[in-house]
Curated annotation (Swiss-Prot):
Pfam families: BRCT, DNA_ligase_aden, DNA_ligase_OB, HHH_2, HHH_5. Gene3D superfamilies: 5' to 3' exonuclease, C-terminal subdomain, BRCT domain, DNA ligase/mRNA capping enzyme, Helix hairpin bin, Nucleic acid-binding proteins. NAD(+) binds at residues 35-39, 83-84, 147, 181, 317. The gene is ligA2. This is DNA ligase 2. It comes from Clostridium acetobutylicum (strain ATCC 824 / DSM 792 / JCM 1419 / IAM 19013 / LMG 5710 / NBRC 13948 / NRRL B-527 / VKM B-1787 / 2291 / W).
Length: 669
């Protein structure tokens, strides 16, 4: 073997290794090699490719995207990519199901080779760009194309190769076309927009715009992902069912979404649609519905197609989470930290089943980057049940528009506004009503000092009528003063005084949280207490000591240090302690058990625990409770309708416990 042959052999070894590493990292979310080791092999491959002048089409070096194309070429799909019929209501799903039942019954009454009972498979309907990847007899991806008309699409092979989860070579000996959806995750979207001169307006446009960009380097910058869900053209062994076909896709190394649900009844389908709708906002990518297909391929063949759609599939569409409307005005609001933030007043628009009239604009820098003006038509997005956000302006804005101007004085107290970084602040912390009211409400809230019977209306009256100017003033209020307020009689006043008095003896984590330290939530407050054991230790902790605490980074550490440096905070704390507030810390002794130090995920509906209760129970056992399943998860506790987290646990080989097994374990400790 000469040197060139030896180099080529080594290149093929490296390509196989690197593609295996990429599959484990990007598809299974289970890295099997350190980044440094991957980079070492990758650099060796680059060097050998330069030396030999050979680059194989399935080499990972093709994913860099270092090319600018002159134009898109047309590509004729080997098999048509069908659109799906769509249902906006569940009644339409029932009608579709009844048509299927009738057709199958008619066939079975006239044929001896009976069709099986109807079984459906449900998948998420991804909101991205459909792609069709073609692999030759050697298993090499030779083409990737958009759906286009369904018959003819556009060649996006170079762009698709930048999606690291798409295999460039599969172990298959026949020509096959595999259909998927290219998507942009919310994580990738947010990372891209941090640095983008012109921010992306939504995830779908982010994915579609990347794949239809002739500058492939720009495609690579957007860090797209993909899920695959269908085989179109296939010269290999025919599939008998959708589930068999999906197993083939998985075995070939394609990224497949963890949610894949088999249903036998219309009631099960309805339950699953509701489940996917419930988890929709918690996903890291956009979906706009659920796809329902018949599993059996013989039944599919018998039902056939309309001019536009297959009769054996339908898509249930969710309410839109994104819409366009007109920006009517901007209102400036003050938070408890003194930050003055813009809120958009919108022409009312329906979004995810809710009428939306207001949306966040973040800050003036964000307004400038998105080119938003009063009178503009804007994209509005709602997710995670939070206040909707304006993502950008549409191209069809008509009529007069006006620049949004930042205020120079506080809209509530008239004090001068100062700019710190990208944010505006009112520094009048003592007599600016929104700041004081919101600080008191936060201090008294259930997770903080837990003062029962305290409300925002009460806080407003305390500020306006009793001249309360700090949280310590709460502990100076008398019953007689409370009875001078609206709707306060003897009993209500007594109850609130007793609740305020009772709050003086509080656990340390609740007290730390009640102070409203920027970027410190209840979990961070709890972590601080576990680490430092006393309030005095937390207060005097240095930056270097703070960043050693689990989940505390530089921003949170700086916030804590700066907070305790302030003279007004020192004064307020001293007053609270003088008035009898005595936070205490009790270190709960955790007996070594099966869950100590383990990462646990609870999913589905549990019979004996609410979400909060199971979280508290696990934490009391010394477990770390996580919200998603990964290779670092030790246990998954699965209740009814466990769904995608259960599926991922099975895929990764994570130990799964039923609620009964969990209780048996803790009862035997």
């Amino acid at each position: 073997m000469n040197e060139k042959e030896s180099n080529i052999l080594r290149m093929q070894e490296l390509i196989e290794e690197l593609n295996k590493y990429s599959y484990s990292y990007y598809v299974l979310d289970n890295p099997i090699v350190a980044d440094k080791e991957y980079d070492k092999r990758y650099d060796e491959l680059v060097e050998l490719e330069e030396k030999t002048g050979i680059t194989y089409p399935y080499s990972p070096t093709n994913r860099v995207g270092d090319v600018i194309l002159k134009q898109f070429q047309k590509y004729t799909h080997k098999s048509r990519l069908w659109s799906l019929d769509k249902a906006q209501s569940f009644e339409e799903i029932i009608d579709w199901h009844n048509r299927n039942k009738k057709a199958v019954a008619e066939y079975n009454s006239n044929h001896e080779d009976k069709l099986p009972e109807l079984k459906y498979v449900l998948t998420k309907k991804f909101d991205g760009l459909t792609i069709n990847c073609t692999y030759d007899e050697s298993g090499v991806m030779i083409k990737a194309a958009t759906r286009g008309t369904g018959v003819i699409g556009e060649d996006i092979t170079s762009q698709a190769k930048t999606i690291k989860s798409i295999p460039l070579k599969i172990k298959n000996g026949s020509v096959v076309e595999v259909h998927g959806e290219a998507i942009m995750t919310k994580t990738a979207f947010n990372e891209y927009n941090k640095k983008a001169e012109v921010p992306l307006k939504n995830l779908r446009n982010g994915a579609a715009g990347a794949l239809r960009n002739l500058n492939v380097r720009e495609t690579a910058r957007r860090n797209l992902s993909a899920f695959f869900y269908d085989v179109g053209y296939n010269e290999g062994k025919a599939f008998k069912s959708y589930m068999e076909m999906m197993n083939f896709i998985k075995e070939m190394g394609f990224p497949v979404d963890e949610y894949l649900k088999e249903c036998n009844t219309i009631e099960e389908i309805n339950k699953e649609i509701q489940y996917v709708g419930d988890i929709r906002s918690s996903l890291d990518y956009d979906i706009d519905g659920v796809v329902i297909v018949i599993d059996d391929y013989r039944t599919r063949e018998y039902l056939g197609y309309t001019v536009k759609f297959p009769k054996w599939a339908i898509a249930y569409k969710f309410e839109a989470e994104e819409a366009t409307t007109k920006l009517l005005d901007v209102e400036w609001n003050v938070g408890r930290s003194g930050r003055v933030s813009p809120t958009a007043i919108l022409e009312p628009v329906e979004l995810a089943g809710v009428i939306v009239k207001r949306a966040t604009l973040n800050n003036m820098d964000d307004i400038g980057r998105k080119k938003v003006k009063i009178g503009s038509r804007v994209f509005v997005r709602r997710s995670n049940d939070v206040i909707p956000e304006i993502m950008g302006v549409t191209e069809e804005t008509e009529g007069e528009t006006n620049e949004i101007e930042a205020p120079t004085i506080c809209p509530y107290c008239g004090s001068e506004i100062v700019k710190e970084g990208v944010h505006l602040f009112c520094e009048n912390t003592l007599s600016c009503k929104p700041q004081m009211v919101k600080s008191i409400v936060h201090f008294a809230s259930r997770e903080a000092m837990n003062i029962e019977g305290f409300s925002e209306k009460t806080a407003e009256q305390l500020f306006e009528k009793l001249n309360i100017k700090s949280i310590s003033d709460l502990y100076r209020i008398t019953k007689e003063e409370l009875m001078s307020l609206d709707k306060f009689k003897d009993k209500k006043a007594s109850n609130l005084i007793n609740a305020i008095e009772k709050s003086k003896k509080c656990d340390l984590a609740s007290f730390v949280y009640s102070l409203g330290i920027p970027n410190v939530g209840k979990k961070t407050a709890t972590d601080l207490c576990k680490q430092f054991k006393s309030f005095e230790n937390i207060k005097k902790a240095s930056y270097d000591e703070l960043i050693l605490v689990q989940d505390i980074g530089s921003i949170v550490a700086e916030s804590i240090v700066e907070f305790f440096k302030q003279e007004k905070i020192e004064k307020s704390l001293n007053e609270l302690f003088e008035l009898g507030v005595t936070p205490f810390y009790e270190e709960s002794e955790v007996v070594e058990n099966a869950f100590t130090g383990k990462t646990v995920v609870a999913t589905g509906t549990l019979q004996n625990y609410s979400r909060t209760a199971i979280k508290e129970k696990l934490e009391s056992l010394g477990a770390n409770v996580a919200g998603s399943v990964s290779k670092k998860t030790d246990y998954v506790i699965a209740g009814e309708n466990a769904g995608s987290k259960y599926d991922k646990a099975v895929q990764l080989g994570v130990k799964i416990l039923t609620e009964e097994e969990f209780e048996q374990l803790i009862n035997n400790m």
